[in-house]
Amino acid sequence: MKMKCFAKNALAVTTLMIAACGMANASTVINSKDVSGEVTVKQGNTFHVDFAPNTGEIFAGKQPGDVTMFTLTMGDTAPHGGWRLIPTGDSKGGYMISADGDYVGLYSYMMSWVGIDNNWYINDDSPKDIKDHLYVKAGTVLKPTTYKFTGRVEEYVF
């Protein structure tokens, strides 16, 4: 008699476990197919950067006023948060270098300098072009030689 009671309890426990684990309502798969796909996200086609030397004449000697050495135009109609100009190579630190190896500091009219990050930046999400100038300050002495600046322009988002 005790065996009958145990068997009934075991059957009840098993039924409860199957129902709780979802086995009582398990479905039978009759068809299946694996799927995959790729999608390409393109950069806005209006991203552009133009970096050019001053086209006017610059004379050697002590400069009587601020003198633009390079112009930088950058823009993108795609959403963005801002721009940074990172001096590279010998220009690291924000310098142009002469053919003789002399370093001359450059400044930006529109962008702020962050020395610890070695870059100028501007937080500007406008779709309009930004036209900036890298210049030497009044009083800077320039030699009659060729000066070079190297850098990388980055567009960023937040």
Swiss-Prot record:
Disulfide bonds: none annotated. CDD domains: PsaA_MyfA (cd18777). PROSITE patterns: PROKAR_LIPOPROTEIN (PS51257). The gene is psaA. Forms a homomer composed of subunits assembled in a large structure. Fibrillar structure, part of fimbriae, necessary for full virulence. Residues 1-26 form the signal peptide. Pfam families: PsaS. It comes from Yersinia pestis. Keywords: Fimbrium, Signal, Virulence. This is pH 6 antigen. Induction: Expressed inside macrophages under acidic pH and at 37 degrees Celsius. The keyword Signal applies. It is found in: Fimbrium. One of its GO terms (cellular component) is pilus.
